[in-house]
């Protein structure tokens, strides 16, 4: 699931993913966060 959060590194996405999908799992792709539910 892509969320509307800009990123430069995957670690920036973990707190955002935790807030969005309840799980701190994801990575930075093309400058945006992708979360794994």
Curated annotation (Swiss-Prot):
Coiled coil: none annotated. It is found in: Secreted. Gene3D superfamilies: Knottin, scorpion toxin-like. Expressed by the venom gland. PROSITE patterns: SCORP_SHORT_TOXIN. One of its GO terms (molecular function) is toxin activity. The keyword Protein biosynthesis does not apply. The keyword Signal does not apply. Keywords: Disulfide bond, Ion channel impairing toxin, Neurotoxin, Potassium channel impairing toxin, Secreted, Toxin, Voltage-gated potassium channel impairing toxin. Residues 26-33 are annotated as: Interaction with Ca(2+)-activated K(+) channels. One of its GO terms (cellular component) is extracellular region. The record marks 36 as: Aromatic residue of the functional dyad. The record marks 27 as: Basic residue of the functional dyad. Disulfide bonds join 7-28, 13-33, 17-35. One of its GO terms (biological process) is envenomation resulting in negative regulation of voltage-gated potassium channel activity in another organism. Reversible blocker of both Shaker B potassium channels (high affinity), and Kv1.3/KCNA3 potassium channels of human T lymphocytes (low affinity). Has the structural arrangement of an alpha-helix connected to antiparallel beta-sheets by disulfide bonds (CS-alpha/beta). Belongs to the short scorpion toxin superfamily. Potassium channel inhibitor family. Alpha-KTx 04 subfamily. This is Potassium channel toxin alpha-KTx 4.4. It comes from Tityus obscurus (Amazonian scorpion). The lineage of its organism: Eukaryota, Metazoa, Ecdysozoa, Arthropoda, Chelicerata.
């Amino acid at each position: 699931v892509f969320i509307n959060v800009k990123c430069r590194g995957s670690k920036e996405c973990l707190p955002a993913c935790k807030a969005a999908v309840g799980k701190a799992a994801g990575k930075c792709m093309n400058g945006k966060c992708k979360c794994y539910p």
